[in-house]
Amino acid sequence: MQQPSELPFISCKCITYGRVDMLEESVNSFLKQDYPADKCELIIVNDYPLQKLKFDHPQVKIVNLDYTFSTIGEKENYATELCQGDVICQWDDDDVAAPWHLQNVAKYFTDDVNILHWNPGVFYNGNAITDITWIGNSGIVFRKSAWKAIGGHPIENAGYDMTFIERLHKHGGRLFAEPPKAEASWFYMWGGRSYHMSGQGHDKPGQPNAIQRHSAHVENLRQQGKISTGDVELKPHWKYDYVQMLDIFVKSKYGTSRTTTVHDISQKQVSRQIP
């Protein structure tokens, strides 16, 4: 068990645009973390000019911009530059993390690791957990020094994440972390919640790119009165008790239970094999 003084400082990086309802669950996930307050931060970059997000908390920094980035890669680079830590968690605005997630990060992201994938994570579809399994590139953790070494995120839209991850893999230090299923901590939220770039395919010549498609979707919702504009005070909350859902799912499907918090478990269970 690591002492607080030995724990790494972790920066949770979140980029967002017009998805307050999802973002509030993401922020709440951060606030629930069982991790020293002086060892973590949440950086939120909002480039939806019609909204100014507000939330007063010493560990949460929100940057509201008056312009929209032309590529997601540029936005990711801007947000990464703001991160104080060398260990950076991708903290998507439409995903959820269990309270022991940063303890998992500290446990598995050792000094020789530059990029970490979760195998397993929690696959959440619609309004239910459907599997505890490999979740691809969702919730990756990477090292800022490695990000700098490869030149940052590529200046791309749809598909930028694959390019970035492939470059990090080539750089070295790839890890597939294998927490016990009962202690999986990153929820990949898929289906029935919001516009999801992963389901929209790659950009194609002559057609609107990912930024343009998402902007049009948000504008349509705004015109329907479904999106607030101006100053928006965030009210972090979870719509469901995701920890309880996870405990019930794991016990019913696998017959196991989470009997202790992650930071009480001293043995690392990791794999460097591609799932």
Identify the function of each model-found stretch.
Residues 1-29:
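N-proximal low-complexity "stem/linker" segments adjacent to membrane-targeting elements
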